[in-house]
């Protein structure tokens, strides 16, 4: 019986050594672990006690067309402070008829001399003081659960003589 135990304890070490020898060639599939692959073989990771090495056909590495990675220009990330997501119940939406839209004479368009267009192609927007925004007292907080947004009024700024002067220089 003791000779049988010796054979049993003597046999596993060579198998473990084989596994250790083959492991350096195995890490690339293990490092590229893509959870989107739904193959049952992929989830089987060899355990320390398990000396069975998965077959080459069992471990599936996703092909270039399988995993979709958005292209650099495809994904749009909003600039900090640009997108504001309101918390539920905290959204302030004015009721229809309560929002005072500035009249044509009320909106202050920057003077022709206040807009500078640099030669590099960058557009300098008017400073906060140049455009007059209606104060907070004009809008009312709606009844909770009522979410109708007023239609935005596009403001058009036409380039004045300042741009023509810049082009002439």
Swiss-Prot record:
Residues 1-24 have a biased composition (Low complexity). One of its GO terms (biological process) is keratinization. It comes from Homo sapiens (Human). It is found in: Cytoplasm. Induction: During squamous differentiation of epidermal keratinocytes. Residues 155-169 have a biased composition (Polar residues). This is Small proline-rich protein 3. The modification N-acetylserine is found at residue 2. The keyword Acetylation applies. Coiled coil: none annotated. Belongs to the cornifin (SPRR) family. One of its GO terms (molecular function) is structural molecule activity. Residues 1-57, 150-169 are annotated as: Disordered. Cross-linked envelope protein of keratinocytes.
């Amino acid at each position: 019986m003791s000779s049988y135990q010796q054979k049993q304890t003597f046999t596993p070490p060579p198998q473990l050594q084989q596994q250790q020898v083959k492991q350096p060639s195995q890490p690339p599939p293990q490092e590229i672990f893509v959870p989107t692959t739904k193959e049952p073989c992929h989830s089987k990771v060899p355990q320390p006690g398990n000396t069975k090495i998965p077959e080459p056909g069992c471990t599936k590495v996703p092909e270039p067309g399988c995993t979709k990675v958005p292209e650099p220009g495809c994904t749009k990330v909003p600039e900090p402070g640009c997108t504001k997501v309101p918390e539920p119940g905290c959204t302030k939406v004015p009721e229809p008829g309560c929002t005072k839209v500035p009249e044509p004479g009320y909106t202050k368009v920057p003077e022709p001399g206040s807009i500078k267009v640099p030669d590099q192609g960058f557009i300098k927007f008017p400073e906060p003081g140049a455009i007059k925004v209606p104060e907070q007292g004009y809008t009312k907080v709606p009844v909770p659960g009522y979410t109708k947004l007023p239609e935005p009024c596009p403001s058009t700024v036409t380039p004045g003589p300042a741009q023509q002067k810049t082009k002439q220089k």
